[in-house]
Amino acid sequence: MKFAEHLSAHITPEWRKQYIQYEAFKDMLYSAQDQAPSVEVTDEDTVKRYFAKFEEKFFQTCEKELAKINTFYSEKLAEAQRRFATLQNELQSSLDVQKESSGVTTLRQRRKPVFHLSHEERVQHRNIKDLKLAFSEFYLSLILLQNYQNLNFTGFRKILKKHDKILETSRGADWRVIHVEVAPFYTCKKINQLISETEAVVTNELEDGDRQKAMKRLRVPPLGAAQPAPAWTTFRVGLFCGIFIVLNITLVFAAVFKLETDRTVWPLIRIYRGGFLLIEFLFLLGINTYGWRQAGVNHVLIFELNPRNNLSHQHLFEIAGFLGILWCLSLLACFFAPISIIPIYVYPLALYGFMVFFLINPTKTFYYKSRFWLLKLLFRVFTAPFHKVGFADFWLADQLNSLSVILMDLEYMICFYSFELKWDESKGLLPNDPQGPEFCHKYTYGVRAIVQCIPAWLRFIQCLRRYRDTRRAFPHLVNAGKYSTTFFTVTFAALYSTHKEQNHPDYKVFFYLWVFFCIISSCYTLIWDLKMDWGLFDKNAGENTFLREEIVYPQKAYYYCAIIEDVILRFAWTIQISITVTTFKPHVGDIIATVFAPLEVFRRFVWNFFRLENEHLNNCGEFRAVRDISVAPLNADDQTLLEQMMDQEDGVRNRQKNRSWKYNQSISLRRPRLASQSKARDTKVLIEDTDDEANT
């Protein structure tokens, strides 16, 4: 592998600009070589002066890069030292509390089952668990910094070696010895000491001296490009997707030849539509994950996933393919129900019952940690006012806004099975009398409108909670206003529908109000998508017209196509309303909803790419590469004060004025070293050495 590719694959994305600009140096060298005057047409002194002038410029650029790297490394090292002192402080406090309560200095007592612990012991147990996670993330940050150190030194060595080869000189090697090999970022070995001390603390204080268990906890995932999935996972993805495609073709033929034309099919479509949307969402999320990895968007950090254990795009494809097969088989079973002894209404219940069991399965199988993470996140979303809202929380709530049809179809299924289904009839399609009342699919009894508002309500209260935590009216209250427009839209749509059915003369008033609020909501959400969520139309965009100053994805056309797509699908409701109002054929609304629901999932799929890109660029601006985890986090007031200081011109950016404050703060974090630190061992991450000149 060429070193340029190796560097690109192994850098920490959030620190990209702080690495040696290896490609720029290569371009300088090759450009100088191509533009050099030929000895055949000019004298030798002119050639020497040309290369001397170039070398002066080249080494000046090297000095700037070296100064940049030294400064960044020193800042991150100081940050790591402060963080380590804080973690030591918290660990020692936990040990002291435990010593006072139990008289035991080790943590072996916590192995008692959690449900047998007192309230104080439960709190202590959670603190120890949080400390383990905090040390694990801190260790990852140390390895990333050590990787930064090694990659930059290798980059200087490679580019100076290339310089000497092209210019046929040894001044590059001399410059490396004089400047690079004595640079603080290379000579400072404190990072190795911190790594060793962290291993010792985790081994002796948190894992009772079991180094193997400690190192398993601290294990760092491979740094660099996404690792290939296991062969069996790849095989299952191909197998499931292939079977799913074949079954879909079979479904089409079965629908044409087996459906009974004297029965309405809409109960069946409404019941199975939600399952299809969920499968589509999982598959598109797999494409999202693949695209983020390829572009260097660190979604693992953004969602605060465990970097040592999370689902890859292949795992998501596997789950989507497997559920897709079950969905197809269940629907086929409904088509062939007349020749089966099993009642038709059993098949949808079996399908969705299995999906629910797959999610809540308590055994540590079938991606247990990922399922538990999702359940915990869903709990946080539905109890939003009582928790601080993180990115993953409001991201999932946004996904639910695009999957509202699933909730409405779930409500319909419950209502249908409760009130409209004829349980004594087991043949044919799910029975539904076209001439009889069909109130489950209408707004008549009010529940449907409430269910339709649930996703928007979740985001609305999340925005209010974020305003409570930060006291910032913009963007949080303004964002809450955006979601509140959904309440008016749904309310007037329900009033229009019910009044029109009952032939009230004022139904047109509600229709105009419905259209008016649809326009307001679409304009509001469209502007928020493009400007706030995606960060586009930045006045400092420069050559990236109508975009932003920095973009991650390689082609500008992606952004322009996404803007057009978002405009079209945000106003797709105009087609739905136009056709529904002007056409009096039955179930036209169902047909339009069935067509546009997958398109809304696709719109959210595109939205995900640029929303996470914008969040990734925010992390890059803060050089945030790992999760911030603490047993004693800042309270809301302290967090707000810190954010305000960061926004001020004389805040944390002005390091000279606040040096005394930082010094005092670092002093307050000091604590006598734990005894376990004297047993530290060295641990290094080996960076592939690409010495072969052909690979540079």
From Swiss-Prot:
Free-text note on domains in this protein's UniProt record: The SPX domain plays a role in the regulation of phosphate flux. Inositol hexakisphosphate (Ins6P) is bound between two SPX domains of the homodimer. The SPX domain has high affinity for inositol polyphosphates and its affinity for inorganic phosphate is two to three orders of magnitude lower.
Intramembrane features from the record: 366-383
SPX domain mapped to chain residues: 2-224
Ranges of the Extracellular topological domain: 260-264, 338-343, 423-429, 504-506, 586-587
GO MF, one annotated term: virus receptor activity
Modified residues (Phosphoserine): 668
Region Important for inositol polyphosphate binding: start-end pairs: 158-165
Family: Belongs to the SYG1 (TC 2.A.94) family.
Subunit structure: Homodimer.
Residues that, per the record, bind phosphate: 398, 401, 482-483, 570, 603-604
Keywords assigned by UniProt, alphabetized: Cell membrane, Membrane, Phosphoprotein, Transmembrane, Transmembrane helix
Region of interest (Disordered), residue spans: 672-696
InterPro entries: EXS_C (IPR004342), SPX_dom (IPR004331)
Protein name: Solute carrier family 53 member 1
Residues with Phosphothreonine modification: 690
GO-annotated biological processes: cellular response to phosphate starvation; intracellular phosphate ion homeostasis; phosphate ion transmembrane transport; response to virus
Described function: Inorganic ion transporter that mediates phosphate ion export across plasma membrane. Plays a major role in phosphate homeostasis, preventing intracellular phosphate accumulation and possible calcium phosphate precipitation, ultimately preserving calcium signaling. Binds inositol hexakisphosphate (Ins6P) and similar inositol polyphosphates, such as 5-diphospho-inositol pentakisphosphate (5-InsP7), which are important intracellular signaling molecules involved in regulation of phosphate flux.
Residues in the Cytoplasmic compartment per record: 1-228, 297-309, 384-388, 472, 535-553, 627-696
Localisation per UniProt entry: Cell membrane
GO cellular component terms given for this protein: Golgi apparatus; plasma membrane
Catalysed transformations (reactions): phosphate(in) = phosphate(out)
Spans traversing the lipid bilayer: 229-259, 265-296, 310-337, 344-365, 389-422, 430-471, 473-503, 507-534, 554-585, 588-626
Pfam families for the chain: EXS, SPX
